[in-house]
Each structure stands twice: as structure tokens, then as C-alpha cells.
Design a protein with these regions (language model features):
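Short, structured segments at the rim of ligand-binding sites
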Residues: 1-351
């Protein structure tokens, strides 16, 4: 077996061009396709989720294999349900065929969608026959994946009666729902919260427009981690293409890492303008980190590793959705951290 030895540099002084936001890219692509426009959004992410959506939308094969891309599976399920006159089978990897999709399928069926399972009930593959859906009032649990909710919202403007989506119980990942609504409005939709638990989407078609995707705050988290671990005031990392006031849920990384000593400085704070962000280590760290990741669960892994290496005790909550990703991320964290000598304990699969 080949072994590699990785050594940290003596000094960090780098400018990094981050990848485009996967979350915004995937939403913008679906909305662009629903607008039936010809101007593809600019600066799209090159991640697997985005690539399989681009391929499916461009080639339109009868059987669409979205591989291990969970976002693509959920967004394309809704999208194909409103493509009048088209029929497709939506499938993926073996792991994807064991990831539940029944909540979304049931909700779409309530709106009139023609979707059937070709294998095990409640799981992909799906056979979807697109048609004009009526819309109206729909209730779903607020604690389901925000991708299910976003998938339903994005087709709202195409429904004859629009969509009134009522979320029952505790609402998790609200920033991702807000990101979807914001992206929809960028393309002309009338969609917003009408009460704490209800979202109203008017039956107003999307309009085509040029659109530039800002860079990814999730990708920024690893550079924040490097600065936090560097323990040197002279170290500096510059990240290009980020926005102050970003709607990305993972933009909370700047606040959380401030608790671990990383200072964030924006070149400009003009709204809607991507700019360069400078990171420095102040060497001031909280003695213990407590945080609820319910609104940004994908950041949890970065902070588990970072806190462990910094010897900062931590207690993280809001991690229930990590169990049903492309792998069980909580078990993977426990397994890999154990190899480094750290013992993690999870409670109720959510903290």
C-alpha cells in the first residue's frame, strides 16, 4: 500500500478561487429549465450533483441515471412531474436505491403527479409521467429534508393554482428553504413566507434572465479550518467570489469559526457583489464549542475534526439528516476519528 506524508506549510499566504455554490447552481438550473430559457446560468458548479442535472436536462434520456447525487434525485423528481407529455425513469447507484424518497413522491401525488416505483416502494427508481398539475394547499412535515421542500417550491409557479405549502411541526434547515425562495424570486417568481409555517407561491411563470452564481461558502469552510489550525497571526488566506449577506445556509461558517479565532474581512460589503474575503487567526478561542447545526448540517464534519485537533471540547446538535446522506456521515465520523485516537459519542442519532 502506498503511503503519503502530508506536512503543513510554515506560513499560509495564499489566494484561493473557490468553486461556485452547488446549492445555488442546482436551484438555478432547475428554475432555468422551468423558465424554458436559452441562457444558461454562468459560473455553474462542477460538482457531481450539478453535472448530472446538466446532463439530464440537456440530453433528456428516457432513463436518467443521477448516480449518487441526492439533490439531483429530489429536484429532478419534481421537475419531471410537471414536464407535460414526457415520461422518464429516474434511477441511481445501489446506495441511492436505498435512500427514501416516499415523502416527496406522496406530496407530488397529492398535487396530481403520476409517479410509480419500479422497485421497492418508497425508494428509487421512479417512473414519472409529466403533466400539468393543479396545485393548491399542501401540508408536509417541517422536519423533513429541506431538499424535499425546495423541490416542491420550485415547481410552484408552474402549477395552475400555484402552491400554498404548510410546514407542520418543527422546521429544520430554514436557511436552505430561504435560499430556494430567494433564487426563485431572482427569476421573477412571487414566493414568500405568508406566516411562520406557510409559504405561498403564486402561479406566475419564471422569466428568463442572465444569472451569475456566487462561490461556495461550504467550500470555504476547509480554508477556515486551515487558518484555525495554523496558530500563527501572520498567516493569511484570501478567498475569492464570496458575498457578504449571502443567502447560502453555510455562510454561517464565518460566525462559527470566529469562535475558534478566525477573523473574516470583506473587501467590499456591497449587497449582491462577490468579493474577496481575507482570513486571519486572532488566536482567541472559546474554551468549549456548543452549536446547533440544524440549519447547516453539512458543516458539522469540518467542526468535529477542527475542534478535536484544537483540543476544544464540543457538543453539536441538529445532525439527524447526516444519517441519510450518500453514507451515514455520523458513523463515518466516529469510525475515522477513532483511527486518530478520538472517541465520539452520538445521542439519538442527532447530536
Amino acid at each position: 500500500m502506498t503511503q503519503y506524508e502530508i506536512k503543513a506549510p510554515q506560513l499560509l499566504n495564499q489566494t484561493i478561487k473557490l468553486p461556485a455554490s452547488k446549492s445555488i447552481s442546482n436551484r438555478a438550473l432547475i428554475i432555468h429549465a422551468l423558465s424554458e430559457g436559452s441562457i444558461l446560468p454562468d459560473n455553474l458548479s462542477d460538482c457531481d450533483d450539478t453535472e448530472v442535472i446538466i446532463d439530464a436536462l440537456h440530453n433528456k434520456p428516457y432513463e436518467m441515471n443521477i448516480k449518487a447525487a441526492g439533490t439531483a434525485m429530489r429536484f429532478m423528481t419534481s421537475f419531471l412531474s410537471v414536464k407535460k407529455g414526457e415520461e422518464h425513469v429516474l434511477t441511481g447507484t445501489e446506495r441511492m436505491k436505498h435512500r427514501p424518497i416516499g415523502v416527496l413522491v406522496d406530496a407530488l401525488r397529492q398535487l396530481g403527479a403520476d409517479i410509480s416505483y419500479t422497485g421497492e416502494e418508497g425508494f428509487p427508481p421512479l417512473r414519472i409521467k409529466g403533466q400539468q398539475l393543479k396545485g393548491g394547499l399542501l401540508e408536509v412535515p417541517g422536519n423533513i429534508s429541506s431538499q424535499y421542500i425546495s423541490a416542491l417550491l420550485m415547481i410552484g409557479p408552474t402549477l395552475s393554482d400555484g402552491l400554498t405549502l404548510r410546514l407542520t411541526g418543527k422546521i429544520i434547515s430554514r436557511p436552505y428553504i430561504d435560499l430556494t425562495l430567494w433564487t426563485m424570486r431572482e427569476f421573477g417568481a412571487e414566493a414568500d413566507w405568508s406566516s411562520y409555517e406557510t409559504i405561498t407561491v403564486q402561479p406566475k411563470p419564471y422569466r428568463e434572465r442572465t444569472y451569475y452564481i456566487e462561490n461556495d461558502w461550504s467550500a470555504a469552510s476547509y480554508w477556515y479550518e486551515m487558518v484555525a489550525l495554523s496558530k500563527n497571526r501572520d498567516n493569511v488566506v484570501r478567498l475569492e467570489g464570496l458575498m457578504d449577506g449571502s443567502k447560502q445556509g453555510d455562510s454561517s461558517v464565518r460566525y462559527i469559526f470566529s469562535l475558534l479565532g478566525v477573523k473574516t474581512t470583506f473587501e467590499t460589503t456591497e449587497e449582491g457583489v462577490p468579493t474577496t474575503v481575507t482570513l486571519r487567526n486572532t488566536l482567541h478561542t472559546v474554551p468549549r464549542l456548543e452549536y446547533d447545526f440544524v440549519n447547516s448540517p453539512d458543516l458539522a464534519q469540518t467542526f468535529v475534526v477542527c475542534c478535536a485537533l484544537m483540543n476544544v471540547p464540543f457538543h453539536f446538535r441538529g445532525l439527524s439528516t447526516l444519517k441519510i446522506k450518500e453514507t451515514d456521515r455520523i458513523e463515518a465520523l466516529k469510525c475515522e476519528m477513532r483511527k486518530l485516537g478520538y472517541v465520539l459519542r452520538d445521542v439519538n442519532d442527532s447530536e
